[in-house]
C-alpha cells in the first residue's frame, strides 16, 4: 500500500458513519445515504466542496477540479495531492458531512 492508501484507510476507520466503498473503481468513503463523500484517486483525494472550502482547496498547489475523464470535470469535486495530506481530514469531514445530507 502507498502512504496515500494507508492514510485514506485510516481516515475511513476514524470518521464515524462512513464505510469503504468504490467509485470509478477506486476506494471511496460512503456516507449512510450510500453516496460517496471522498475518494482516493491516484494517491490524491477527491472531495465534494462548495464556496470558501472549494476555493481554499483549489488554492493548494497541485489541486484541481476533478476530471474522471479528460474534458469531463465534475462540478464541485476537487482533487488534492498527497503533498497536502495534513489537510486531507478537514476536507474529507466537510465533504462527507455535506454529502450525507443529500437525498438518496
Residue ranges and their predicted role:
Residues 1-104:
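Charge-dense, helix-prone N-terminal extensions
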Amino acid at each position: 500500500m502507498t502512504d496515500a492508501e494507508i492514510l485514506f484507510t485510516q481516515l475511513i476507520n476514524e470518521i464515524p458513519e462512513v464505510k469503504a466503498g468504490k467509485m470509478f473503481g477506486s476506494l471511496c468513503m460512503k456516507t449512510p445515504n450510500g453516496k460517496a463523500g471522498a475518494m482516493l484517486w491516484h494517491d490524491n483525494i477527491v472531495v465534494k466542496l462548495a464556496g470558501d472550502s472549494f476555493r481554499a482547496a483549489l488554492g493548494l498547489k497541485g489541486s484541481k477540479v476533478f476530471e474522471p475523464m479528460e474534458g469531463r470535470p465534475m462540478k464541485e469535486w476537487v482533487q488534492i495531492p498527497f503533498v497536502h495530506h495534513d489537510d486531507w481530514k478537514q476536507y474529507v469531514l466537510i465533504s462527507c458531512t455535506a454529502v450525507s445530507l443529500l437525498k438518496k
